[in-house]
Amino acid sequence: MAESSESFTMASSPAQRRRGNDPLTSSPGRSSRRTDALTSSPGRDLPPFEDESEGLLGTEGPLEEEEDGEELIGDGMERDYRAIPELDAYEAEGLALDDEDVEELTASQREAAERAMRQRDREAGRGLGRMRRGLLYDSDEEDEERPARKRRQVERATEDGEEDEEMIESIENLEDLKGHSVREWVSMAGPRLEIHHRFKNFLRTHVDSHGHNVFKERISDMCKENRESLVVNYEDLAAREHVLAYFLPEAPAELLQIFDEAALEVVLAMYPKYDRITNHIHVRISHLPLVEELRSLRQLHLNQLIRTSGVVTSCTGVLPQLSMVKYNCNKCNFVLGPFCQSQNQEVKPGSCPECQSAGPFEVNMEETIYQNYQRIRIQESPGKVAAGRLPRSKDAILLADLVDSCKPGDEIELTGIYHNNYDGSLNTANGFPVFATVILANHVAKKDNKVAVGELTDEDVKMITSLSKDQQIGEKIFASIAPSIYGHEDIKRGLALALFGGEPKNPGGKHKVRGDINVLLCGDPGTAKSQFLKYIEKVSSRAIFTTGQGASAVGLTAYVQRHPVSREWTLEAGALVLADRGVCLIDEFDKMNDQDRTSIHEAMEQQSISISKAGIVTSLQARCTVIAAANPIGGRYDPSLTFSENVDLTEPIISRFDILCVVRDTVDPVQDEMLARFVVGSHVRHHPSNKEEEGLANGSAAEPAMPNTYGVEPLPQEVLKKYIIYAKERVHPKLNQMDQDKVAKMYSDLRKESMATGSIPITVRHIESMIRMAEAHARIHLRDYVIEDDVNMAIRVMLESFIDTQKFSVMRSMRKTFARYLSFRRDNNELLLFILKQLVAEQVTYQRNRFGAQQDTIEVPEKDLVDKARQINIHNLSAFYDSELFRMNKFSHDLKRKMILQQF
């Protein structure tokens, strides 16, 4: 019985029916079992398990049954096909009759029926004890059900915001790429999800050294300003998630997309309604460790995250770029899309799914989503270009909220993806296929005073505030201007006032009054004029240096040119526009053409530049301080002529300068020797091989006690830079307590002297100049109001500037007239030394005229010095005779003879 049961079970399998051993067509001895075989058959559509069942169960049973069974082909073969009505009647119960219409099963119904039949056969097999559970069907069913179950668990975990252990167990070792490249690995679903969760966890849990949540504060600040950029420090990411930091430079496009999605989820978890402001959050990577030069970018940098720096030379306007585009079918008006537009290629539909037509299609303007697009060009910084090389440049693309983050003239640090794209013009020019390269910007950081103000620490602010309370802070700052240049105290004072600047005004919003102080240096060759300009370029937070010979009118202001590719007119900025909110330094100012010099009239007074060229009518800001250096006519300054006669400049230009500094190269044996000692000592101290003075940079060391050092210690150059930045940004002095009558009287006196001597004209601009200098002096002391000391210093600087431009014949009389103003904040010893030098010069002239030669020792009666000193209210000269200043200038006092001696 067991044998017959076994043979029946095997015969009813699909494999045997395919071999022709179907029990329905077998011998009459087995025909009685046809009904049972039909009811127990698993179905006609079962998958074949021929090889698998034979491999698992073996083939001994069926082979023995076939050998021992009856012969089907033989003499009695016809009897098997005779009609037997009783046995040929099928059971109608549960079966569909042949004459009935049977509906075709769907795929899901067929799969359900097959699953039910497999379950039935499995239970029947277990009941007979012949198959172990899961031998044939369970393994397949589990293989099919497990991905579905895991997929449902993943979706549930993603929706609930919970991390599923089973979901990430297969990619716990994320750095194991399993033979894939980084780009392929991070594009897979499993690693993408793991990176997504790790970065989200990093944003939620990263704290600084003080235990504060870093990104909670940054996200809060970002949402307050309605921005969509979240800055992530690469060093923080590398310290916490080193695997993500390793993947990021290799596959930046894929990683940044995952980071953006994770950041958006974190932001929406904190501020659920922030999606009304923006649907995208862009993660910006800063402080990438390796900085590449523009000229060092090569093929191996393609599609990698790089960091470089340069100066922005040009930029386009902000243009709309397709982000998610939809198309309309012109034949059936069906809306196709959305299609995600990438940077590398344009996505276009092939055919309409509604009417199957191949077009034409047009962009659906209403439903298409755009993003901001701007193209800039950055050029290598002048200081980083190798000797004998020209600066290289590279195009960069700014998207989203990065547009207008920089302007021409800004020095920036750019982090982005180095891409290549097709450029037809390059192929035409080179004759073979080449690709243009462009940097897709991810993060832009400017290097200007705004960044510097933000970088001032609390310790810096405390140090600056304490310095401002020093009574001699003004003298310290004046002495800190170009400390490696000997003498020229008046020039240093004027440049210091120009660096701090006054306060701009706009009464009623109708007329702008500039606050910048313009300075003109004029004098003999070899008097350090250009060195002063170079020093200002280094110490100023924003400076543009140019020369009169190499600068044209459009080079100083602005010019219009046609873009070589798009053929549209673009506006390019000149030196004055690039120096906005900074200093424009012009050397060899007298070498400029008159037409070029006329173009800066508007920029120096109204501080704007009007352009009307090629259909472009606009006005550009040029709010900068102009410091220029010029040589006199004939090469040397002639003191017997006025300033206007010595310099080839027109009166409109001269009147726009607030401070005029005349530098004369006079022969003075004592001063010449002191200058020579100073220069030699400076060379010795700053020689590269002198290791002892290696830490003293930019000549910020303490110089010997000389008259031009004001007798105080100069400030270090870094401290001076921070002091200037803080004062210009935070201090805005007012004029409420200013002595207006003193300024008015000084203006009337200067006008009268100007008309009498025929020197430079005094205009209303000089009143504004005095006010600006008073505000600058108040800003040096970090005062909120202009006091009398500030006005006196402004008058003194204005008078020195005015008197130095006079003829030598009227200079002495004017110094006597304005002696009480010129003596402000001067040390008595300095005044007495000045008077004594005048007496010595008169004695030298007398001896040359009488004896034809100069003696080694000059004697000046003490009575002459005492009389001169009484005129300026100085009665006690004993302190002057004992001072270091008196001895340094090689003077000695003979008490017996009451004579003052000077050795040459």
UniProtKB/Swiss-Prot annotation:
GO terms for molecular function: ATP binding; ATP hydrolysis activity; DNA binding; DNA helicase activity; DNA replication origin binding; enzyme binding; histone binding; single-stranded DNA binding. Residues 473-679 form the MCM domain. The lineage of its organism: Eukaryota, Metazoa, Chordata, Craniata, Vertebrata. It comes from the Eukaryota. There is a cross-link at residue 178 (Glycyl lysine isopeptide (Lys-Gly) (interchain with G-Cter in SUMO2)). Early fractionation of eukaryotic MCM proteins yielded a variety of dimeric, trimeric and tetrameric complexes with unclear biological significance. Specifically a MCM467 subcomplex is shown to have in vitro helicase activity which is inhibited by the MCM2 subunit. The MCM2-7 hexamer is the proposed physiological active complex. The modification Phosphotyrosine is found at residue 137. The modification Phosphothreonine is found at residues 25, 39, 59. Residues 1-15 have a biased composition (Polar residues). Residues 111-125 have a biased composition (Basic and acidic residues). The keyword Acyltransferase does not apply. This is DNA replication licensing factor MCM2. Residues 2-257 are annotated as: Interaction with KAT7. Pfam families: MCM, MCM2_N, MCM_lid, MCM_N, MCM_OB, WH_MCM2. Residues 1-80, 109-167, 686-705 are annotated as: Disordered. A motif (Arginine finger) lies at residues 655-658. The modification N6-acetyllysine is found at residue 216. Its main location: nucleus. Changing residue 27 to A: Impairs ATPase activity of the MCM-2-7 complex and reduces phosphorylation by the CDC7-DBF4 complex. A zinc finger (C4-type) spans 329-355. It comes from Homo sapiens (Human). Coiled coil: none annotated. Residues 61-130 are annotated as: Interaction with DNJC9. Acts as a component of the MCM2-7 complex (MCM complex) which is the replicative helicase essential for 'once per cell cycle' DNA replication initiation and elongation in eukaryotic cells. Core component of CDC45-MCM-GINS (CMG) helicase, the molecular machine that unwinds template DNA during replication, and around which the replisome is built. Belongs to the MCM family. It is linked to Deafness, autosomal dominant, 70: A form of non-syndromic sensorineural hearing loss. Sensorineural deafness results from damage to the neural receptors of the inner ear, the nerve pathways to the brain, or the area of the brain that receives sound information. DFNA70 is characterized by slowly progressive, postlingual hearing impairment. It is found in: Nucleus; Chromosome. The modification Phosphoserine is found at residues 12-13, 26-27, 32, 40-41, 53, 108, 139, 381, 484.
